[in-house]
Amino acid sequence: MSSHEGGKKKALKQPKKQAKEMDEEEKAFKQKQKEEQKKLEVLKAKVVGKGPLATGGIKKSGKK
C-alpha cells in the first residue's frame, strides 16, 4: 500500500514579511484615517442621543 498524504504541501499562511519603514505619505494617510474615524464616532454619538430621524418599516393604515 502506498502512503497518500492529504492536504496541501505548502503552508496556507505565508510567513509575515518584515515591517517595512513607513513613508511620510503612508504616515499622513493613516493619521488622516484616524481623524476621520474620530469624527464619525462623534457624529454617531450625537445621532444616538436624538433618537430615530425617520420611522421605517411597515406603515399601518387606520382602516380595518
Swiss-Prot record:
Residue ranges of the region described as Disordered: 1-38
Composition bias, Basic and acidic residues: 27-38
Species name: Homo sapiens (Human)
Matches recorded under InterPro entries: TMA7
Listed name of the protein: Translation machinery-associated protein 7B
Lineage of the species this protein comes from: Eukaryota, Metazoa, Chordata, Craniata, Vertebrata
Family of this protein: Belongs to the TMA7 family.
